[in-house]
Amino acid sequence: MNLLERIKKLPEDWKRIITVAKKPDKDTFSMYLKVTLIVMAFVGLLAYLIQLVLAFII
């Protein structure tokens, strides 16, 4: 399948994904949001600590 055929097929694939996908309920969305925020905070804290340590080493 060449690139042009793949590009022409994209809207059909997107439509299929939208019809199969379902909206999460409130509890599931809340859980995903909490997990995402906790992971973002952890990564931010880790990056800050690494930057802080490297600032004192260099």
Swiss-Prot record:
GO terms for molecular function: protein transmembrane transporter activity. The chain crosses the membrane at residues 38-58. It is found in: Cell membrane. GO terms for cellular component: plasma membrane. Signal peptide: none annotated. Essential subunit of the Sec protein translocation channel SecYEG. Clamps together the 2 halves of SecY. May contact the channel plug during translocation. Belongs to the SecE/SEC61-gamma family. Component of the Sec protein translocase complex. Heterotrimer consisting of SecY (alpha), SecG (beta) and SecE (gamma) subunits. The heterotrimers can form oligomers, although 1 heterotrimer is thought to be able to translocate proteins. Interacts with the ribosome. May interact with SecDF, and other proteins may be involved. This is Protein translocase subunit SecE. It comes from Acidianus ambivalens (Desulfurolobus ambivalens). The gene is secE.
